C-alpha cells in the first residue's frame, strides 16, 4: 500500500509541476507576470537548487559540482523567476545526462553583468536542434518526459531581467546553457 501511495504522490507532484509550468508560460506569454526585483543571493539560490538534485545525482552516479565567484554578493533579480530558470535548466541537464555523467554549475560576475552556466555531459544537440531549442513545445527527444515549454519559459524570464541566454552543444558530448543578467537593473 505504501508503495502505491508513494507512486500516486510522486506522479501527483509531476502533474502539479506541469500544470504550474503551463500556467506560468501562459502568464508570461500574455505579459501578466510582472517582475519583482530585489537584492538576491543568487549563490544561495543555486545551493538550494543543488540540494534538491543531490540525491538524484548520487543515485545515478552523476558527478555534480558547483563553482562560484559571487562570494555571497547580492544581485538584482526576481527570486522566483531565477529559481524557475535554475530548476528548468537543472531538470533538463539531469533528464539528458546518462548515469555516470557529469553536471556542473558555475556562477560568475564580469563587468556590469553576472550569471550562471549549467553544463552537462548528456546527449547534446545538433545544429538544427539548437536553432529550435527555445521554441515553445519543441522537444529534442520525444521519448523523454516533458512539455516542451520549459526552455521557452526560461528564455522569457531571462529576457524579463533584460538578460540573455545562450546555448552551446555537441551531439553525444555536452550541452551548456549560459544565462547573463545585468548587475544593475535600476
Could you describe each region identified by the protein language model?
Residues 10-15:
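Short alpha-helical segment of the dimerization/phosphotransfer core of two-component systems
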Residues 100-112:
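Short beta-strand/loop element within the Bergerat-fold HATPase_c
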Residues 36-51, 83, 115:
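A conserved beta-strand-to-alpha-helix junction within the catalytic ATP-binding
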Residues 125-137:
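Short conserved segment of the HATPase_c
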Residues 36-41, 58, 63-73:
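Conserved catalytic submotifs in the C-terminal HATPase_c
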Residues 26-37:
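Helix-loop junction within the histidine kinase core
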Amino acid at each position: 500500500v505504501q508503495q502505491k501511495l508513494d507512486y500516486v504522490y510522486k506522479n501527483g507532484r509531476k502533474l502539479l509541476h506541469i500544470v504550474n509550468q503551463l500556467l506560468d508560460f501562459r502568464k508570461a506569454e500574455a505579459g501578466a507576470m510582472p517582475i519583482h526585483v530585489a537584492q538576491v543571493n543568487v549563490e544561495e539560490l543555486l545551493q538550494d537548487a543543488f540540494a534538491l538534485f543531490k540525491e538524484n545525482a548520487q543515485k545515478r552516479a552523476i558527478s555534480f559540482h558547483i563553482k562560484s565567484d559571487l562570494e555571497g554578493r547580492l544581485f538584482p533579480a526576481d527570486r522566483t523567476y531565477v529559481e524557475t530558470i535554475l530548476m528548468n535548466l537543472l531538470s533538463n541537464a539531469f533528464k539528458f545526462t546518462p548515469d555516470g555523467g557529469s553536471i556542473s554549475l558555475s556562477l560568475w560576475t564580469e563587468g556590469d553583468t553576472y550569471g550562471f552556466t549549467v553544463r552537462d555531459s548528456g546527449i547534446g544537440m545538433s545544429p538544427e536542434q539548437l536553432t529550435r531549442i527555445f521554441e515553445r513545445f519543441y522537444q529534442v527527444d520525444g521519448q523523454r518526459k516533458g512539455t516542451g515549454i520549459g526552455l521557452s519559459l526560461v528564455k522569457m524570464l531571462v529576457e524579463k531581467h533584460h538578460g540573455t541566454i545562450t546555448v552551446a552543444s555537441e551531439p553525444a558530448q555536452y550541452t551548456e546553457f549560459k544565462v547573463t543578467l545585468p548587475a544593475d537593473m535600476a
